[in-house]
């Protein structure tokens, strides 16, 4: 990635749809940043055999993803690994990934299927004790008791970061991760609830309250509709038109997040269309005269 650069297109998701979008966008000479988790974590990577991808019967999911990513890299797409914690739509789009902020003119959503039930109290206390990013908000809780809800591979590392700040950390999950520091208290729980008054006062784990000032819920991904609440959906999928445009200007979507069928070929095709539409959007906007400018005679 190129630090401090404002990208023409930021692609959220490194699966077939996102990588197809990156290839098509580079073909239109647009700068592209792909943000996602490790490609090995993609559902396609776990497919031992793919028999319905045109021209490549019997290919493994890993082989397909490796070819897709290599193609995008060779064309000059930039990549960053991490979870998108927040997204601000103002003068383009500003994405927070870990502790870094990336800027883009347009956004292509291709995160796959992100279904995640909210914990009771999560939405109510978001920003009032509930956070999705330890590196972003940890300093606010220096020296205070906090709970980490571990739902991602890097959650133990973020718990260690909070501990290094002087936070009194308790880690809650269905199973203790092997990489969790031994001196961080662990609570095994399947049912979690966040309670409080004006702000968070406790994480309730299987009925037992854990007093805390903050709860860090660390998932592998944040649902696009949580990042952009104004996104319109239909049957739990992002609503798009034939150009893969969403209800938010400058935002396009492709792949499994737009609904079924959940097929690689469909994702690749939609990624292509989304990138071409984003490029056309940029070109059209770039050709518009500045506000108040006279066309002359």
Question: Where are the regions that the model predicts?
Answer:
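A conserved FAD-binding loop/helix module that cradles the flavin
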Residues: 22-23, 156-161, 166, 254-292
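FAD-site-proximal beta/loop scaffold in flavoenzymes
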Residues: 118, 124-140, 218-265, 273-276, ...
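A Rossmann-like FAD-binding core segment of flavoenzymes
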Residues: 66, 72-96, 102-104, 164-242, ...
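Short, Lys/Arg-enriched N-terminal segments with co-localized hydrophobic residues
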Residues: 1-4
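Glycine/small-residue-rich loop that forms an oxyanion/phosphate-binding "nest" at active or ligand-binding sites
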Residues: 75, 79-143
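Short loop/helix-cap segments at secondary-structure boundaries that form the rim of catalytic
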Residues: 25, 44-46, 118-123, 139-141, ...
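Beta1-alpha1 glycine-rich phosphate/pyrophosphate-binding loop at the start
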Residues: 7-63, 144-178
């Amino acid at each position: 990635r190129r630090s401090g650069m404002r990208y023409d297109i930021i692609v959220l998701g490194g699966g077939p749809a996102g990588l197809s979008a990156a290839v098509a966008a580079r073909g239109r000479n647009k700068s592209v940043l792909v943000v996602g988790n490790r490609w090995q974590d993609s559902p396609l990577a776990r497919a031992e055999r793919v028999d319905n991808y045109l021209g490549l019967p019997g290919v493994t999911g890993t082989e397909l993803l490796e070819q897709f990513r290599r193609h995008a890299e060779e064309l000059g797409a930039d990549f960053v690994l991490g979870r998108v914690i927040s997204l601000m739509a103002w003068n383009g789009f500003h994405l927070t990934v870990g502790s870094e902020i990336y800027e883009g003119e347009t956004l292509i959503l291709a995160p796959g299927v992100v279904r995640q039930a909210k914990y009771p109290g999560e939405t109510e206390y978001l920003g009032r004790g509930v956070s999705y990013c330890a590196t972003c908000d940890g300093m606010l809780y220096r020296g205070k008791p906090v709970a980490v809800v571990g739902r991602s591979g890097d959650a133990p590392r973020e718990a260690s970061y909070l501990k290094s700040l002087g936070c009194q950390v308790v880690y809650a999950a269905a199973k203790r991760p092997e990489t969790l520091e031994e001196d961080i208290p662990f609570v095994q729980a399947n049912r979690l609830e966040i309670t409080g008054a004006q702000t968070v006062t406790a994480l309730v784990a299987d009925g037992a309250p854990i007093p805390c000032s903050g709860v860090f819920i660390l998932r592998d991904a944040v649902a696009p509709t949580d990042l952009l609440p104004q996104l319109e959906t239909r049957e739990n999928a992002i609503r798009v038109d034939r150009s893969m445009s969403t209800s938010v200007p400058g935002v396009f979507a492709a792949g499994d997040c737009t609904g079924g069928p959940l097929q690689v070929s469909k994702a690749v095709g939609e990624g292509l269309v989304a990138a071409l539409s984003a490029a056309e959007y940029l070109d059209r906007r770039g050709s518009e005269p500045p506000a108040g400018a006279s066309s002359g005679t």
